[in-house]
Swiss-Prot record:
Molecular function, one GO term: acyltransferase activity, transferring groups other than amino-acyl groups
Pfam family, one: Acetyltransf_1
InterPro entries per UniProt: Acyl_CoA_acyltransferase, GNAT_dom
Name this polypeptide is given: Uncharacterized protein YrkN
Matches recorded under CDD domains: NAT_SF (cd04301)
Gene3D superfamilies membership: 3.40.630.30
N-acetyltransferase domain ranges (all copies): 9-169
């Protein structure tokens, strides 16, 4: 439901030809917190090119542009499991110039509305992404249910694709969030 101050957004399916630009904008948005926390992105873009490609090509993946007034202001990659209705938000971003305008919440509500049979949504975010943690918990109603770290690894975490396959920027330190939408019958 759209409130008076909530911007209207539209989800538009991304075409295969859109994916390189989508990836670039996603990585630019993700770089902000990395640079604020670590000072740079010396080891390459976050998420890595390989991780983004894996998300684009995962079974059940759907890639959306987030549009406001006809402008591309962000994007999302969701994975939909129509058998279990346990769905995943793999990647989600709002371009930095559109932050703090309610676009993220409007987009998330549009995603929820697109998949009304969802029983559970799941996502992860790095431990240092305070903005994301606030968004998922305090705005969207997710709950933190797990903390992946060197002592408790994420069995589904994409590796960074480098030859040494070492974690990138504490790659293993992620919070896992879930949002239960409805109880199974």
């Amino acid at each position: 439901m759209k409130t008076k101050n909530e911007p209207k957004v539209i989800l538009e399916l991304a075409k295969e030809s859109d994916l390189p630009e989508f990836q670039k904008k996603l990585q630019e948005a993700f770089a902000i917190a990395v640079i604020e926390t670590f000072g740079d992105c010396e080891d390459g873009p976050i998420p890595s090119d390989n991780d983004v490609q894996e998300s684009f090509n995962a079974p059940g993946a759907v890639v959306y542009h987030i549009l406001q007034d006809g402008k591309n202001v962000g994007g999302a990659v969701v994975r939909i499991n129509s058998q279990t209705n346990h769905n995943s938000l793999d990647l989600f971003y709002v371009s930095p110039e559109y932050h703090s305008q309610g676009i993220g919440l409007s987009a998330w509500k549009a995603i929820e509305a697109q998949y009304p049979d969802t029983v559970l949504w799941e996502t992860v975010t790095p431990y240092f992404e305070k903005r994301n943690i606030n968004f998922y918990v305090n705005k969207c109603g997710f709950h933190i249910v797990e903390f992946y770290n060197e002592h408790h690894s994420n069995p589904h975490m994409h590796r960074n694709g480098r030859e040494d396959d070492k974690p990138l920027l504490n790659d293993d330190d992620f919070f896992r969030f879930v949002k239960i939408m409805k109880k199974k019958d």
